[in-house]
Amino acid sequence: QTIQNIFKVLKEIFGNEKLVAERYVAAKLKDMLHDIIGRIDYESNNAIAEAKTKPPSLRKKKGKDEYYLATTNLPTEPDHLHASQLSFYYHCTKRKPFLFYVNEKDYVIFDDSHELLSKDYLEEQYNIMTKKLLSWEQLIIFCKGDLNKLAHFAEPPELNHPFYYRDLIQQQKQ
């Protein structure tokens, strides 16, 4: 059903326009050594769309040794990390941005009428992202690629990130 909902979203956003999926894009600041690379989920001549699926989660029935699949709620606002990702695709294409979330029951679509997908916000997010990446490149050069030296300059990872660091054991988290 999730796939059917994705088709509904694509029809709602793009109508009968021809689509390209998973196109690679690359960009960098003039001072950067390496390109930033990404893949646009869906793209037409006029718009881009980033898809985020919310699959059901496995839950245990209270007091029983039974499990069931529970629908994951759709967000009421775009996630800032997803808007940041979309900012890169927007920078590369300058096409109308869409961010959608879909589960097996429904979907929600955000477009540039939302503050987090506005042109100004996306450009600001792209600038923040590229400045961070440029700083990392310069730091790697300064440390001559020595990971031990580099680790002294790094801030600790965000262990509460929605999809990174899920499988760390307690020793790694410390």
Regions found by a protein language model. Name each.
Residues 15, 31, 64-65, 104-106, ...:
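Intrinsic-disorder/low-complexity loop/linker signature
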Residues 67-83:
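A short acidic, glycine-rich active-site loop
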Residues 84-88:
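Structured soluble/peripheral alpha/beta segments that form catalytic or ligand/cofactor-binding pockets
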Residues 1-45, 172-174:
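Metal-dependent nuclease catalytic cores that hydrolyze phosphodiester bonds in DNA/RNA
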Residues 40-72, 89:
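Conserved catalytic cores of phosphodiester-cleaving nucleases, focusing on short active-site segments
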Residues 20, 43, 47-51, 97-101:
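A structural signal for short, well-ordered beta-strand segments and their strand-loop junctions
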Residues 76-78, 90-174:
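Metal-dependent nuclease catalytic regions and adjoining charged, substrate-binding loops involved
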Residues 26-28, 54-56, 104-107:
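Short, solvent-exposed loop/turn segments at secondary-structure junctions
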